[in-house]
Amino acid sequence: MSKKRKRAAPKGQNKKKIENSGYSGGGANLSSNILKSWFPVKLSSKSDIDRNLQILRNRASDEAINTPIGAAAVNTSTLNAVGTGLTLFPRLKHRILGISPDDAREWSRRVRQEFDMWASSKDCDVYRRNNFYDLQYIAYMAYLTDGDSFALFRRKMPTSWMPYSLRLQVLEANRVSNPLLSGNTAPYGISSVEMRNTDNGNRIVSGVEVDDDGAIAAYWVSNKVPFDRIDVDGIVEWQRVEAFGPRTGMPNILQICHDVRADQYRGVPYLAPVIETLKQVSRYTTAELASAIVKTFFSLFFTQSATSMDVGDVLGNPYGSYEGESVDESHAPIVDVGEYALGAGTLNALPKGVDVKAVDASNAQSTFKPFLDELIKQVGAALNIPSEVLTKAFTSSYSASRAALLQAWDEFKARRVWFARDFCQPVYEAWLTEAVATGRIEAPGFFDDPLIRNAWCNAEWFGPAMSILDPTKDVTGSHLRVLYGLSTREREAAEMTGSDYEDNLAQIAYEREKMQELGVTESDKTISSASAAAGDGQDEQSDEKGDETDEKMLENPQRGRFL
């Protein structure tokens, strides 16, 4: 019986066809020439952030100090988010407290006056150098440069001129770190990023002590910057500062920081995403500056024909004679360079066979400006600051310039809210607690119920107003928001001018009374006509005419205030 021969399978029939699916054909492609050698690794926030913090801070600090664009980014954000300081506006919840709106306004007015007495005094600073509003500027700039900053609550005896004991001490990020060579700590793992407190078993991550749940328990603060080569007085010592008081639950130290990842305990410098680009911009700018300086030089070369004598015989040896070389004094150079000069109407006679040629240092048109503008746009996009605002160059139309301001203002307002939550509001609550405890401010039920305490402590913080390109349009928009119930006069006054609406009303009433007393009348007709003309112009203005108005607006900066 013949055996049946097995039929061979066609070649390649058993091979399964591989097809790209999902991201394997895009960002996860392993065969692309661009991506096949690119294998970045994302690890924990400790590995990605804390391990690189020291070099990030050093480089970001250098960029913020020594590069124009880096300094512009930090200074612009600080100036617009904080400026001269955020101002307190108490907003106690009178319905929860069971008091009338009039009583609530009177209490708020009293608290603002009392708080400003403490905040405007340099006694609120433990160093007695800055008031509370100046400390805001310092803390915010340190937060941008280093990624986070800290403020310690300190106490000093009240005096006749300062009835409060609360003091603030602002610290930079490098003052909070792991306590190296300390008796009650031990290294943990292979990196000094994380250590362990042997007293309670808590972990210490870059100076932040956390419990088993990951909650912050304490901060380790050094008495000076570790490894400082100038401040060598005494040894570096660390002190453990509990994050919150065990009896009151109030913070003992504030960390100004905005987290971007889960399980993050330290902040990332503001300039971290653009450090490399800023460095390249700085190098490119320096090279172009050196090239521009070289172009201003005017160089001359003496040349000789083939039949003339040696060039050394013509000009002499500019470096003098060599050691041991005999010099024939009678054989002087034919051309004394010191006798020839350039000037208007100057005529110089050169020996036979000697010629002068000028070197033109100019080259082709440089692409410096367009290339630099593109790099600055990338930097601005990463920092959420349009390039027009970053460079203070408003060369486009009014609409484009205002759009850039509005985009930047969204960034500034967000950072202002973060900063007020981390710094201003906790400081106000600590101050108000002392004011109520000492009897300078009356707040019934403040220490009895957390809900009541929160109702008394509720507040808003307003800072510098957004720059205005066309005051007429902005005031008209503000008027319409109030008219349709989208905002209040008090909020508009605070956001547009940083002023208090009730103070404005009192001053206006006084001015009108004084004008009537002196027989001066207001030109209401002129004001109404101007407002009507502005409204008609906005309704009938075409896009083409709008662009012409925009150009005139930018040419006449007196009509608006730029950043």
List each model region and its residues.
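Extended, helix-rich architectural segments
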Residues: 1-146, 153-166
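Activation/maturation switch segments at domain boundaries
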Residues: 2-5, 354-358, 364-365, 405, ...
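Surface-exposed loop-to-helix/strand elements on domain peripheries
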Residues: 105, 122, 126-128, 343-469
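Short coil/turn segments at secondary-structure boundaries
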Residues: 130, 153-155, 292-297, 390-394, ...
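Extended, Lys/Arg-enriched charged tracts that mediate electrostatic binding to polyanionic substrates
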Residues: 137-231
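Acidic/polar, glycine-anchored loop/turn motif associated with catalytic or activation segments
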Residues: 214, 379, 492
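Short, surface-exposed, low-complexity cationic segments
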Residues: 223-245
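Extended, charged amphipathic alpha-helical segments
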Residues: 246-401, 531
